[in-house]
């Protein structure tokens, strides 16, 4: 489906904090440069007919103030839309509410840098247990679909994606991504021993290899 190591190396991962009205929140950010003009990347990320071609089926009213729902996943409210430079929305799953911000930047050579920041209130116990990879690996997987779609123009079949995720390549990808989230966690100030233990638990949860 994709060159595992090439995709792992193509993504930059960052961990941080942000102060919101309700208090301090954790942030995880993934960013990747694509060989596609900004208008094409914007369309891939906002067109309801195109989003399912690389991510998940989506329904709702995709405009500021409108509600969206990803099939079998999160929903939320679109809070800001600045075409083609970015958008922001709530990310609601069950009784948990967090936020996403997507930023697009045109680069030389008709390329585009996409950065996605996920902002969430996470209690210290949960963060210590699984670290940033609990959310970050999921976004890594999403960027795989976008990379395939933008580079080839083809639709990423959901069954093909599920089969790849369960394959040796898919498990290797998640393990390597978890290691990179360990690096990002340590760079953000987490003690290496704690970050390593959290990354190992997250790897086991994603790959089904046990703890």
What is each of the regions a protein language model found here?
Residues 32, 76-79, 99-106:
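Hydrophobic/aromatic beta-strand elements that line small-molecule binding cavities or substrate pockets
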Residues 87, 96, 103, 115-117:
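Ligand-binding pocket scaffold of soluble enzyme catalytic domains
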Residues 1-21, 119-211:
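Terminal "cap-and-tail" regions of soluble proteins that handle hydrophobic small molecules
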Residues 59, 86, 92-94, 98, ...:
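Vicinal oxygen chelate
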Residues 41-42, 51, 78, 87-89, ...:
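Hydrophobic pocket/interface hotspot
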Residues 32-34, 69-70, 74-77, 90-93, ...:
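Hydrophobic alpha-helical segments that drive targeting, anchoring, or assembly
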Residues 21-23, 29-30, 36, 40, ...:
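Short beta-edge strand/loop motif at the mouth of beta-sheet-based domains
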Residues 83-84, 94-96, 107-111:
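Short strand-connecting beta-turns/loops that link adjacent beta-strands
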């Amino acid at each position: 489906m994709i060159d595992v190591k090439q995709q792992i190396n193509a993504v930059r991962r960052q961990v941080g904090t942000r102060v919101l009205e309700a208090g301090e929140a954790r942030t995880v950010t993934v960013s990747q440069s694509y060989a596609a003009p900004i208008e094409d990347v914007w369309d891939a990320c906002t067109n309801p007919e195109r989003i399912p071609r690389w991510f998940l089926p989506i329904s709702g009213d995709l405009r500021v103030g409108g509600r969206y729902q990803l099939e079998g996943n999160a929903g939320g409210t679109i809070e800001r839309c600045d075409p083609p430079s970015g958008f922001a929305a709530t990310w609601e799953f069950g009784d948990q509410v967090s936020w996403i911000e997507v930023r697009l930047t045109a680069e030389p050579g008709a390329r585009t840098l996409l950065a996605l920041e996920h902002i969430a209130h996470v209690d210290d116990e949960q963060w210590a247990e699984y670290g940033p990879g609990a959310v970050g690996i999921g976004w890594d997987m999403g960027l795989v679909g976008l990379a395939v779609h933008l580079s080839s123009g083809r639709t990423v079949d959901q069954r093909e994606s599920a089969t790849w995720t369960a394959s040796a390549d898919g498990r290797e990808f998640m393990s390597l991504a978890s290691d990179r989230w360990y690096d990002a966690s340590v760079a953000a100030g987490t003690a290496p021993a704690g970050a390593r233990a959290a990354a190992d638990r997250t790897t086991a949860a994603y790959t089904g290899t046990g703890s």
